[in-house]
Amino acid sequence: MTVTRDLTILFALTTGAHLGPKTVAALLTHFGNPEAIWDAGVADVAHQARLTEEGTERLVEARGLTDALTEELELIIESGTTPLSILDDNYPDRLRHLPDPPIIVYVRGEVPEETQTAVAVVGTHHADADGIAEAVAWGKGFAQRGVVVVSGLARGIDGGGHTGALAAGGKSVAVLGSGFNNIYPPEHRVLAEQIEHQGALITEHPPRAPLTKSRLVYRNRMIVALSDAVVVVRVHAPESGTMEAVRQARDLARPVYLVGADTSHASVRAVADGAMPIGRLPDFDLVLKYL
């Protein structure tokens, strides 16, 4: 893979100038293409992006770093990571349906085709052994039926879903809230390597980007977008990453199933937000029937 001029400019806007996906998308719409953004005056770009003085200074700095950023992209590629911009044909089509698709995604492994059925298995990272065992069973059962299991590599339910899929020889996709140099949690590094070989790791953050709570929550939109349905094995709190995934699924018209719903505040909120309660015994036919 070679580093294109368009990729370098988009990398400069996202990583150098720290512009978010909606802002960069608006600039692409207004100017037409990355080169036109770069050729425009700083004041014009800053006005269209509604940048503060500090943001404008970052933009000016980023514009002077194109050679260095090109070299950084080349090193990223040499490390085994594939950066794909939203302008690339190989960019995951499912992500294009988001209202705020990542401008660049970084991939290790191979993202399954959009035509391959995929289901997200998500839930609390506070899960007990029984909850994790249920997640493993869901992941394994989906993989045995040729379904890709998507999750977020977190402790608890996420890790269980990935583990089950891999144990069955299936494919799994992990969406990270950090760059690949900062796999989290650290104890899932081996699991991440296995996922890379039997599916894909994907993130919207460059390799050195650290994990933050907001990035963990924000990545849920990608987990949902890459899936045809969402199975929530455990929900711990009404204001959590899992609940954000439920809301994202509702907004993207993805069916959501809540395993073993009870009378807890979190379960009640999940159902109110559109999750369908189902029993603890995995019912794969129910989830896959209308996909």
Language model region names:
Residues M1-L87:
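Short, small/acidic-rich helices and loops at N termini and domain boundaries
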Residues M1-D6, S85-L291:
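Glycine-biased, small-residue-rich flexible motifs in mid-sequence functional cores and linkers
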